Amino acid sequence: MTQPVARDTAGTFSDYCISDISLAAWGRKEMIIAETEMPGLMAIREEYAATRPLQGARIAGSLHMTIQTAMLIETLVALGAEVRWASCNIFSTQDHAAAAIAAAGIPVFAYKGESLEEYWEFTHRIFEWHDGGTPNMILDDGGDATLLLHLGSDAEKDPSVIANPTCEEEQYLFASIKKRLAEKPGWYSKTAAAIKGVTEETTTGVHRLYQMHEKGKLKFPAINVNDSVTKSKFDNIYGCRESLVDGIKRATDVMIAGKVAVICGYGEVGKGCAQAMRGLQAQVWVTEIDPICALQAAMEGYRVVTMEYAADKADIFVTTTGNINVITHDHMKAMRHNAIVCNIGHFDNEIEVAALKQYQWENIKPQVDHIIFPDSKRIILLAEGRLVNLGCATGHPSYVMSSSFANQTLAQIELFCNPGKYPVGVYMLPKELDEKVARLQLKTLGAMLTELTDEQAAYIGVPKNGPYKSAHYRY
């Protein structure tokens, strides 16, 4: 690993920790391709380049270090921000993307296959400016950067909150916090106090924010980017529809047609995954707790079952829920020989991976493992239960990430430039900005929008140029 310091003795930038800086040229070439596929993000970069609304922003970023994220990072920098970045998943980094960002002089701490100890070390590093200052904004995916400051601040007052880890992830998180508390007492509360706000990318991270706010523990305002329509209805559905199959195919080379595929959860992500499997002619079954989502699945022609029913009958299992222990040890013991098990929700605890540690693991290739049970039956676990589309492939296509990252950029501008507008709480981007992102994305698709006449706008009671739907409208 390349060890990070602010500058080496020759004055060369080296404030990064990545796999291989020599991959930078490759990463830059892929970024050039991605640029043409990210019209919304590029249009926002062009619109705000002259005014640089993020001048003075210091953004601590925790989001998958991919080629598309590299385009987001450079957009934030072009708009005036200083940025330090880490990946929000130990397997999701594209090493050539990280190298391209490091070569551009932007601090980045990420490589594919980090240990959990390194993961939390890198998350700490995004908060450490070399002039001794702190960030004033967070851009988060899954909520780990936000969690770190909140849990660390709590531990400063009551060390018992990090005394009893319940899983391997918490063991390393708690250990990293204890280390920081010993080295720099008061660091967490000082750092949290400087944060103007956080913008959150995912369903899982948004749930964390709402939970903290309901308990009165949220320390700074947050914008829920995930539930912007041009994020959740596009990234979550259409992104997963393409990247799930990409991950499974790269990992296993399995023929999907004719297989029984179980999609655990039928939210936006589950809907996209079910469409993907159906498109390749799998028999798609869905598990759901919510009767409304279950009814939607049934009306789309999917069979709605329970995991207990499906465990010994299906060939491919995909968790999409954001919940814990959706696929349990007992479910996996019941599965067929060579059943494929994977997750496309944010954390690895949707599958009870910890219970599999008692068995023999045979690594087939990176992020593909055979779990060998005592009766010699094997199941194929992808990405150790972490995000299959990023662990075994390269994540969502650039075009759909343009929409998501356009929202992230606008949310960062909104929070940073209007601090008095947002007391502590969780907010949505205005509908006008949601529609703006959609307009920008449409330009490269050859789409022609119909325009309301004055008479039509008056008749349905909406502004002629939008927004066209109420806040509670369900697209």
UniProtKB/Swiss-Prot annotation:
Q: Does the keyword NAD apply?
A: yes
Q: What class of enzyme is it?
A: hydrolase
Q: Where does substrate bind?
A: T66, D141, E201, K231, D235
What are the record keywords, sorted?
Cytoplasm, Hydrolase, NAD, One-carbon metabolism
Keyword NAD listed: yes
Please list the cofactors this protein needs. Answer: NAD(+)
NCBIfam families found in the cross-reference section: ahcY, PRK05476.2-3
Check the record and name the PANTHER family matching this protein. Answer: ADENOSYLHOMOCYSTEINASE
Q: Which family does it belong to?
A: Belongs to the adenosylhomocysteinase family.
Q: What protein name is recorded for this chain?
A: Adenosylhomocysteinase
